[in-house]
């Protein structure tokens, strides 16, 4: 179960997302992929020779923060048999992010959470979607880890910050959603949950698969 500094965490339906190409729908939990071949190989490479969990977590954070270049938006194009789909802010599978070496905050958090899930249980690792207050509020994604009876924020966009940032002492990060490859949660009252075929979050409106939500598929 994730941890929130303020607010009540509630379980929610998996969210239908369309953030790739050709309007393809995917579930929110599909973006954390601990069993992908590239993720498993990368996990083994990063953790080789590291004796403690703490060392391995630092290694994973350092890799994603430094080796995967950060850009606020990732424009991507897919062409299949002459048909082309363009997405100005694509959510990519962790394996693709690893291979291309570039990602937005969400893509980097998906990859880091997928790596961490090779070390920790679903109860201990979540991607967090929320707001970062840095002069003004902006949407952001990061990871949360429960380890040694403490909860930590792990900032996946940067390697030049401490790996372990205590959830209890950080006010700049405001969580709205938590998820991994198994389940999804929200902070009660921070998003409107609208019931259609699925009970969807209006906070995610820019990435939702509205065709599915409105029953057109």
Positions of PLM-derived features:
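A structural boundary/capping signal
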Residues: 1-217
């Amino acid at each position: 179960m994730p941890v929130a500094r303020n607010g009540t965490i509630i379980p929610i339906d998996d969210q239908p997302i369309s953030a790739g190409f050709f309007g393809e729908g995917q579930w929110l939990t599909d973006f954390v992929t601990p069993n992908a071949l590239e993720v498993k190989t990368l996990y083994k490479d990063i953790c080789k020779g590291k004796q403690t969990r703490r060392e391995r977590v630092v290694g994973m954070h350092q890799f994603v923060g430094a080796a995967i270049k950060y850009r606020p938006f990732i424009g991507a194009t897919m062409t299949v048999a002459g048909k082309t789909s363009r997405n100005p802010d694509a959510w990519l599978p962790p394996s693709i992010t690893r291979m291309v070496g570039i990602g937005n905050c969400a893509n980097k958090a998906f990859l880091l959470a997928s790596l961490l899930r090779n070390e920790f249980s679903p109860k201990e690792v979540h991607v967090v979607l929320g707001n970062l207050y840095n002069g003004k509020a902006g949407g952001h994604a990061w990871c949360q880890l429960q380890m040694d009876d403490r909860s930590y924020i792990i900032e996946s966009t940067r390697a030049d910050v401490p790996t372990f940032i205590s959830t209890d002492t950080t006010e700049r990060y405001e969580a709205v959603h938590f998820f991994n490859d198994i389940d999804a949660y929200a902070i009660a009252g921070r998003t409107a949950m609208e019931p259609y075929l699925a009970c969807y979050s209006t906070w995610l409106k820019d990435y939702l698969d509205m065709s599915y939500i409105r029953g057109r598929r």
